[in-house]
């Protein structure tokens, strides 16, 4: 929670308008609504990219820029290039077929591994399991899944 509190210092204090942006529900571990976030969360923070990564790594976070190959909200679409700094071990893309082209176009991605994700916000938008990571999950718990995922991601191929 320390990370969340620290990031909050860099957020713009703009109140959410649920009628426009939707409710920002706070759920418990059983998906029961236990509150609503009043501050609008879709805004950017006051952190630049390098500062955000530095802050995340201070808390031992795994940093992976999302949907870098998408024009809207992807880092390449926003910046016009993939930045040389900070360095990332992984980047998430929506189409695994773009891997070699991205590495050719952006030399600083040459040593980067890619995670392919549908970026689905609804169950019916999830693609077939063409790209997947097998994880040990017994006895089932979200903590085990999270630990297994990070362990697998840290084993660069």
Q: How should each PLM-predicted stretch be described?
A:
Residues 1-89, 97, 107, 145:
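Extended substrate/RNA-proximal surfaces in nucleic-acid metabolism proteins
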Residues 68, 95, 118-120:
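Active-site metal-binding loops of divalent metal-dependent hydrolases
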Residues 73-80, 124-137:
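Histidine/acidic-residue-rich catalytic or RNA/ligand-binding cores of hydrolases
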Residues 83-90, 109-114, 131-134:
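Glycine-enriched alpha-helix->loop->beta-strand junction motifs that scaffold or abut catalytic
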Residues 96-102, 126:
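Acidic/histidine-rich catalytic cores of soluble enzymes
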Residues 102-109:
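Short, aromatic/basic amphipathic alpha-helical patches
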Residues 112-128:
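Short acidic/histidine-rich active-site segments
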Residues 137-157:
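Mid-to-C-terminal alpha-helical segments outside catalytic/metal-binding sites
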């Amino acid at each position: 929670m320390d990370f969340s509190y620290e990031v909050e210092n860099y957020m713009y204090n703009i109140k959410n308008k649920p009628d426009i942006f939707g409710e920002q529900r706070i759920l418990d571990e059983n998906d029961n609504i236990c509150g609503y976030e009043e501050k609008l969360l879709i805004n950017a923070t006051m952190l630049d990219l390098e500062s955000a990564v530095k802050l995340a790594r201070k808390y031992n976070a795994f940093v992976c820029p999302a949907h870098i190959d998408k024009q809207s909200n992807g880092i390449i679409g926003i910046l016009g290039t993939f930045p040389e700094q900070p360095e990332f071990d992984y980047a998430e893309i929506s189409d695994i077929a773009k891997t070699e082209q991205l590495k050719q176009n952006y030399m600083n991605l040459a040593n980067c591994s890619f995670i392919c994700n549908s970026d689905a916000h609804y169950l019916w938008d999830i693609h077939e399991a063409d790209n997947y990571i097998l994880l040990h999950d017994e006895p089932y718990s979200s903590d085990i899944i999270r630990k297994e995922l990070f362990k697998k991601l840290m084993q660069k191929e």
